[in-house]
């Protein structure tokens, strides 16, 4: 009958789709062609399944061909992707979206994500975080402000450079190992005094002037703006665990080298000889370039 013919056609279409998915699962080359990706696209295959897709700088515009694949990790960094709906329902644990046009993260709901990197995306709504159990969260240069949304996560790495965060209180008692709040309005480090696990801290270009709350911690690396510190500098001088100290304008320094420069007054304007500009022609002052994020 006509109805049976229509049903048969529908069945054939479904089977064709299933066969296509099976082919893609077993053939990374076919998947690359379906995606329209360049040679930068790399895939990890386990058995007959593609389980990881590294599409960084692959020229990708759509993730539709990935629909239905059992992917655990995807890197979409520096691609043209904006729609994540084809990823809904995937068992993703690691998702990198840095420097994409993605704005809506609703398709991530229910995923077992552990690592999520959103640097320089168009995300403004962070309600999707509810119920997530992230261990690594990167929201550099985004309007993220409420740390209460991550309070109950088992985070060990949290990068907030250029975000709207001002208060670190929700992080008190956390198990963070690495925290980056560079170029934020954070001024008080007291909540970190109970974060005994903290090893790497970036507070460069913040409003922090007092380092005394860090007493008792065992930091291994710190990034800071020495010229802004007014109190507690001896707190980190006494920190035997501290191997590297980086400033907002310097490369990595060993702790010993940093203290040599610090004691010479490298970051103390009052100890610098006045410059002779009497004969120098006046030039318009150019605006400073924004500092590149420095992650601990």
Which residues are covered by each model-predicted region?
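Positively charged, low-complexity intrinsically disordered regions
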Residues: 4-5, 15-16, 114, 120, ...
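Long, low-complexity, intrinsically disordered segments
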Residues: 281-296
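Pro/Ala/Gly-rich low-complexity, hydrophilic intrinsically disordered segments
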Residues: 1-39, 262-279
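Concave beta-strand-loop units of leucine-rich repeat
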Residues: 37-61, 70-82, 86-209, 213-281
């Amino acid at each position: 009958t006509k109805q049976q013919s229509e049903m048969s056609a529908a069945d054939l279409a479904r089977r064709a789709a299933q066969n296509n998915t099976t082919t893609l699962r077993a053939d990374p080359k076919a998947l690359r062609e379906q995606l329209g990706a360049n040679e930068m696209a790399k895939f990890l295959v386990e058995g007959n399944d593609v389980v990881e897709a590294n599409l960084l700088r692959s020229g990708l515009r759509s993730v539709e061909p990935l629909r239905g694949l059992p992917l655990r990790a995807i890197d979409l960094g520096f691609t043209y992707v904006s729609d994540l709906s084809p990823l809904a329902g995937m068992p993703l644990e690691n998702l990198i979206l840095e420097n994409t046009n993605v704005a809506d993260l609703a398709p991530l709901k229910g995923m077992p994500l552990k690592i999520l990197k959103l640097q320089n995306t168009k995300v403004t709504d962070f309600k999707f975080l509810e119920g997530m159990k992230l261990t690594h969260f990167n929201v550099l240069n985004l309007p993220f402000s409420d740390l209460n949304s991550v309070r109950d996560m088992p985070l060990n790495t949290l990068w907030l450079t250029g975000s709207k965060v001002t208060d670190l209180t929700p992080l008190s008692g956390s198990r963070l190992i690495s925290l980056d709040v560079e170029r934020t309005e954070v001024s008080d480090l007291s909540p970190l005094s109970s974060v005994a696990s903290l090893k790497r801290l970036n507070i460069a270009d913040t409003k922090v002037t007092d380092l005394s709350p860090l007493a008792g911690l065992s930091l291994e690396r710190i990034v800071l703006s020495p010229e802004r510190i007014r109190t507690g500098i001896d707190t980190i001088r006494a920190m035997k665990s501290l191997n590297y100290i980086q400033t907002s304008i310097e490369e990595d320094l060993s702790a010993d080298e940093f203290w040599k420069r610090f004691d010479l007054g490298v970051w103390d304007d009052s100890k610098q000889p006045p410059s002779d500009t009497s004969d120098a022609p006046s030039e318009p002052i150019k605006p400073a370039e924004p500092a590149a994020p420095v992650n601990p």
